[in-house]
């Protein structure tokens, strides 16, 4: 799982963050200053890249948070069998399987053997994002 750290105060909408050990796309950030002796807090709302679940985290703005490193690459569909898709990575020609639940909705209808797809490798999870 490849991640790096960033300050919670530097997180912006549209960026990615790890919430509950799942990579999430940030959809809302609220920063609030607390009382006289308190520290500023950031409320970050994200939607899971892999599962689409909405998650929320509240942390001090100076706290370190994990940011996933997203690796994008092209793969070719070898076969489709029921609940999984077998792919070949076009960088090193290794084959691997992805469950059907890890396929973006817009790409589901377009998959057939021989089609090239864009795959995101995020924190150890692989997901088909679109066809090429």
UniProtKB/Swiss-Prot annotation:
A GO molecular-function descriptor: ribosome binding
SUPFAM superfamilies named in the record: Nucleic acid-binding proteins (SSF50249), Translation proteins SH3-like domain (SSF50104)
Keywords assigned by UniProt, alphabetized: Cytoplasm, Hypusine, Initiation factor, Protein biosynthesis
GO cellular component, one term: cytoplasm
UniProt entry tagged with the keyword Protein biosynthesis: yes
Family matches, as Pfam families: eIF-5a, IF5A-like_N
Superkingdom of origin: Archaea
Modified residues (Hypusine): 36
Location relative to the cell: Cytoplasm
Keyword Protein biosynthesis among record annotations: yes
GO annotation, biological process: positive regulation of translational elongation; positive regulation of translational termination
Protein family: Belongs to the eIF-5A family.
PANTHER family tied to this protein: TRANSLATION INITIATION FACTOR 5A FAMILY MEMBER (PTHR11673)
Function: Functions by promoting the formation of the first peptide bond.
Name of the molecule in the record: Translation initiation factor 5A
Organism, scientific name: Caldivirga maquilingensis (strain ATCC 700844 / DSM 13496 / JCM 10307 / IC-167)
Source lineage: Archaea, Thermoproteota, Thermoprotei, Thermoproteales, Thermoproteaceae
């Amino acid at each position: 799982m490849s991640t790096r750290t960033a300050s919670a105060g530097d997180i912006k909408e549209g960026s990615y963050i790890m919430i509950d050990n799942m990579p999430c796309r940030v959809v809302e950030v609220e920063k609030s200053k607390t009382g006289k002796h308190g520290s500023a807090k950031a409320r970050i709302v994200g939607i899971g890249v892999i599962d689409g679940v909405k998650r929320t985290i509240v942390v001090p703005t100076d706290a370190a948070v994990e940011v996933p490193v997203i690796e994008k690459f092209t793969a070719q569909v070898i076969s489709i069998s029921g609940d999984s898709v077998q792919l070949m990575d076009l960088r090193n020609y290794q084959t691997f399987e992805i469950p059907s639940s890890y396929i973006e909705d817009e790409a589901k209808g377009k998959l057939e053997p021989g089609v090239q797809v864009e795959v995101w490798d995020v924190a150890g999870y692989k997901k088909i994002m679109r066809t090429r």
